[in-house]
């Protein structure tokens, strides 16, 4: 696409970053200064009844700056990158039609990638293949299947945790159905985003600062009633750790605690560690992201001015 074609496209803003980096605060500040409407790009915030453990914007924050694509699914329901792309494109079109600018904010980098580059031509799920994989897992364990994936598709295996059965199963399923690896197929892009996108990433200047923010926020969540929130979900009886909602960082560790598998202190330790690992994965995505302008979490005024300056140019 040449520059003239790009200028003809309506503007959009991406505010990306690791967990606990200040994305929400920056986006709300931008809502006060620019003609923007916010769209959440977060695979955890889509779930109803999961407010504290996902650091969902508060009622006061949502009153200041409403977010679209929050609270759109029950925790028992699934939601894919394809679902997100379809929903986000509709919200963006509605915002643009109203003469305003879509501002997409969140940390689910797979969603941002699906929106920006389109979706790869992955095969549909095959229940028989999936059942065969799950049978193998029950006999050999997911660790053995992860080793199998490491031989077939080492890039995907390095990215997928051995304790993530959904993503591990999907990577193997794609190979067994198509004969091509997930890594090969995801290099083939689909329809690109029909917007002129200003892309920003916000993060603290050092990993140590980010780790401190993550630990502080996890304790703030506990003080705010995270355990009680998780217990309501636990007591429903229809939710389990194979569901994406319950595998969300923090909830998975809380589930182990509520099940009696680990004690409270271990839950806190594991929850903080898992959140740091999530932030590390998010930062890895972002460091390989092209056309992104970095902002410093610890200089919110400068970050705000930088975005306004670029978007208003």
From Swiss-Prot:
Keyword check for Transferase: yes
Similarity comment text for this entry: Belongs to the IPP transferase family.
Catalytic activity, reaction form: adenosine(37) in tRNA + dimethylallyl diphosphate = N(6)-dimethylallyladenosine(37) in tRNA + diphosphate
Binding site for ATP: 17-24
GO molecular function, one term: ATP binding
Coiled coil: none
Top-level taxon: Bacteria
Cofactor or coenzyme needed: Mg(2+)
Positions contributing to substrate binding: 19-24
HAMAP family linked to this entry: IPP_trans
Class in the EC hierarchy, top level: transferase
Assembly and oligomerization: Monomer.
Protein name: tRNA dimethylallyltransferase
BP-aspect Gene Ontology terms: tRNA modification
NCBIfam families: miaA
Classification via InterPro entries: Dimethylallyltransferase, IPT, P-loop_NTPase
Organism of origin: Yersinia pestis
UniProt entry keywords in alphabetical sequence: ATP-binding, Magnesium, Nucleotide-binding, Transferase, tRNA processing
The protein's Enzyme Commission number: 2.5.1.75
Ranges where the record places region Interaction with substrate tRNA: 42-45, 166-170, 247-252
Functional description taken from the UniProt entry: Catalyzes the transfer of a dimethylallyl group onto the adenine at position 37 in tRNAs that read codons beginning with uridine, leading to the formation of N6-(dimethylallyl)adenosine (i(6)A).
Residues of the site described as Interaction with substrate tRNA: 108, 130
């Amino acid at each position: 696409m040449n520059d003239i074609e790009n200028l003809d496209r309506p503007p959009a803003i991406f505010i990306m970053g690791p967990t606990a980096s200040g994305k929400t605060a920056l986006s709300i500040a931008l809502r006060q200064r620019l003609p923007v409407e916010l769209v959440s790009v977060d695979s955890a915030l889509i779930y109803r009844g999961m407010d504290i453990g996902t650091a969902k914007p508060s009622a006061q924050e949502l009153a200041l700056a409403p977010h679209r694509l929050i609270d759109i699914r029950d925790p028992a329901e699934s939601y894919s990158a394809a679902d997100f792309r379809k929903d986000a494109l509709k919200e963006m079109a509605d915002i643009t039609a109203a003469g305003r600018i879509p501002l997409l904010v969140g940390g689910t980098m797979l969603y941002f990638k699906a929106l920006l580059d389109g979706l790869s031509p992955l095969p549909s799920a095959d229940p028989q293949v999936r059942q065969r994989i799950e049978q193998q897992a029950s006999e050999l364990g997911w660790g053995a299947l992860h080793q199998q994936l490491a031989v077939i598709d080492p890039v995907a295996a390095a990215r997928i945790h051995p304790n993530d059965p959904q993503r591990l199963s999907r990577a193997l399923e794609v190979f067994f159905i198509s004969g091509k690896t997930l890594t090969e197929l995801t290099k083939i892009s689909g329809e690109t985003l029909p917007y002129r996108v200003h892309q920003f990433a916000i993060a603290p200047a050092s990993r140590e600062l980010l780790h401190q923010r993550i630990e502080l926020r996890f304790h703030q969540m506990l003080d705010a009633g995270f355990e009680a929130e998780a217990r309501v979900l636990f007591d429903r009886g229809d939710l389990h750790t194979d569901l994406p909602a319950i595998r969300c960082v923090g909830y998975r560790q809380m589930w182990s605690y509520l099940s009696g598998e680990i004690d409270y202190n271990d839950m806190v330790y594991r929850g903080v560690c898992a959140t740091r690992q999530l932030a590390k994965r998010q930062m890895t995505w972002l460091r390989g992201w092209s056309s992104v302008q970095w902002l410093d979490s610890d200089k919110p005024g400068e970050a705000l001015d930088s975005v306004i300056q670029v978007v208003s140019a």
